[in-house]
């Protein structure tokens, strides 16, 4: 695993209800992106470009630990600040790369970064990565990494009701037992409280709804 670690889980990409644009940052920026936007205001461009080089290396799956230490020492960045810069920039780029260029235009990308308060010269460097000559290679690497991950091959669940043996009260305590198998042969079994199961149902329904809306919006843009 690279020194940057895994990026934050991808947030869905709803459309902006006011402008009709597709937001690559989701309904609201992740904590990593919000934090890095604040730090980038005081970061010089030379250091930022070195930072971007490390992030691109991490996206390619390279081990960047030694280079990270060298950057921290040369730029006089504390370990905590450097971690925020790396994680936030990594998350920001990864979220942008998850949308195809036809759905996320450079102008919309730069406008969202401006709203975060990121300096214009740094926005230009980020846009060059997201829409420049390196984009096809980054897309290819992302596809290869995604195809190597195991997928769910089997899933089932059932409601389980346990009767309390307490002498003071006997109450029904329903829960949901889940079992799934992955394509790598591993199996997992776990128990989920009813309340959490309902949250899961709602979240899945919401994501599916927003995916459908995004697909329709992309189709309309292609038709226009």
From Swiss-Prot:
Database matches in InterPro entries: COMM (IPR017920), COMMD5 (IPR037357)
Organism: Rattus norvegicus (Rat)
The keyword Transport is annotated on this UniProt entry: no
The protein's name in its UniProt record: COMM domain-containing protein 5
N-acetylserine PTM sites in chain numbering: 2
Tissue: Expressed in the zona fasciculata and medulla of the adrenal gland; expressed in kidney proximal tubules. Basal expression is higher in hypertensive than in normotensive animals.
Described function: Scaffold protein in the commander complex that is essential for endosomal recycling of transmembrane cargos; the commander complex is composed of the CCC subcomplex and the retriever subcomplex. May modulate activity of cullin-RING E3 ubiquitin ligase (CRL) complexes. Negatively regulates cell proliferation. Negatively regulates cell cycle G2/M phase transition probably by transactivating p21/CDKN1A through the p53/TP53-independent signaling pathway. Involved in kidney proximal tubule morphogenesis. Down-regulates activation of NF-kappa-B.
Cellular component GO terms held in the UniProt record: nucleus
